[in-house]
Amino acid sequence: MSEKTIFAEKLEGFVKSLKDHVSSSDGQWTVKGFIDIFKNVYTISSDTKIVSKILEIHLFPKILKFAQDNGYKVVLAEHQNYYPDISFVKAADESVRFAVDFKTTYRNPIKPYLCNGFTLGSHGEYFENRASTKNIQFPYGSYSGHFCLGIIYDRADGATIDETKSHNIAELQAITSVAKNFQFFVTEKWKIASDKGGSGNTANIGSINNIADILAGRGMFSKLGEHWFDEYWMNYKKI
């Protein structure tokens, strides 16, 4: 088996353990908020960026252990806008690297078979020029594979969350979590890419948003292969 196949299989096995790490028995996120020295608990916002960052912090000890158990070093992105979030570098052969990006999104409450979607990194300089070091930890072409570690969840009903209220730590169990019903997945990013750009004005690759297709890796390029994904996005809106 190739290094990429071995890494992918181990990462897939690891991801199956993460739901229990972040969830209570009823599916609620075990993170309830943040605490001050007076033991007051403040509810966190349901803003996706905040939830995503706290989930990363929550999962990081597990990520580190996974890397150590499998002979990899973890290199974090040096800057906030760098790709990827985590580079796994093989300790015995540092030329073997895998890019892993955290992707967090929530289910559509009206159409729960859909999620809000997410971006899959830039199709700009470092994607077009695979030797470039602009906004990327290592050159894109030096990675043996590019993976998404994805998290899909339900947002709590806004009526049950009061961000203006603080709680005593004794009330911890009664605080409604801002997220619940987590679903974790891992896939190579090209397998869940769409043919449309991500949100905003940045040059980002957009994902598909059907949850079943995301979990099965059935994106726009899944039958064509990674080469066609690369060709399409390297030439996006240029032809």
For the regions a protein language model found, what residue spans apply to each?
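Internal alpha-helical scaffold/solenoid segments in large eukaryotic proteins
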Residues: 84-85
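Nucleic-acid endonuclease domains
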Residues: 1-77, 81, 91-98, 104-239
